[in-house]
């Protein structure tokens, strides 16, 4: 794993860890949070259904924006929008307001995931070597969210979400644009095989 010593690879690692950690911080304990603020089962299901409906609209909008602006600009704009929107999670508790705020923030966060896959696919490394760290980041985000939820405050998960979200934007600008991938030392045929799904576990290492 000599590539792990490369500065660029480390930047990809940190980018994916922070982004997927933010995703976990926002969504993994949201039903527990809603229980703690007094929501019953039907109210929680309503909010989650509303979130899914919003996601259908937002994902199409993100795809269109990506075609117009490119990946880096699209991610930046939508992260800033969802960060501003998610501030309402600290204040709103009503079903409609909380549902709209959470639905928009979560839909944008999840909707950006395919763009991060584009970043991984266009990196000078195999797809699995980058995407693996997203899974690790998500798992770490779940664990950290649980700890700070219990020992700090329930709303601390939203602070973690915002902190990781903004950190991912910082590291987004340290990696090449997807439209202009840098030359890789990896074998092109091997990289293509990995992206298509062949020998995923082997290619991670």
Which positions does each model-derived feature cover?
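Juxtamembrane intracellular "pre-TM" segments in multi-pass secondary transporters
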Residues: 1-7, 175-205
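Helix-loop boundary and gating motifs at the non-cytosolic
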Residues: 2-54, 201
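Hydrophobic core of transmembrane alpha-helices in multi-pass small-molecule transporters
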Residues: 17, 85-89, 93-115
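Intracellular juxtamembrane helix-capping segments at the cytosolic ends
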Residues: 30, 109-124
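Residue-level signature of mid-helix packing/kink "hotspots" within the transmembrane helices
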Residues: 52-60, 138-139, 143
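Helix-to-loop junctions at the C-terminal end of transmembrane segments
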Residues: 57-71, 149-150
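Structural signature of the two symmetry-related core transmembrane helices
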Residues: 73-88
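Symmetry-related core transmembrane helices of the 12-TM Major Facilitator Superfamily/SLC fold
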Residues: 156-174
């Amino acid at each position: 794993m000599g590539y792990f010593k490369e500065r660029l690879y480390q930047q990809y690692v940190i980018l994916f860890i922070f982004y997927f950690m933010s995703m976990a911080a926002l969504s993994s304990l949201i039903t527990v949070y809603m229980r703690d603020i007094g929501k019953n089962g039907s109210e929680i299901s309503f909010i989650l259904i509303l979130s899914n409906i919003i996601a259908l609209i937002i994902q199409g909008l993100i795809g269109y924006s990506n075609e117009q602006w490119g990946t880096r600009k699209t991610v930046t704009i939508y992260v800033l929008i969802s960060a501003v929107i998610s501030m309402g999670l600290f204040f709103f508790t009503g079903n409609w307001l909380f549902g709209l705020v959470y639905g928009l923030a979560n839909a944008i966060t999840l909707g950006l995931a395919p763009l991060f896959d584009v970043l991984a696919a266009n990196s000078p490394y195999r797809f699995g070597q980058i995407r693996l760290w997203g899974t690790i980041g998500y798992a770490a985000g779940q664990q950290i969210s649980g700890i700070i939820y219990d020992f700090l405050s329930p709303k601390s998960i939203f602070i973690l979400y915002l902190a990781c979200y903004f950190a991912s934007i910082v590291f987004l600008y340290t990696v090449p644009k997807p439209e202009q991938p840098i030359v890789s030392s990896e074998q092109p045929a091997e990289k293509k095989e990995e992206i298509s799904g062949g020998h995923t576990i082997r290619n991670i290492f």
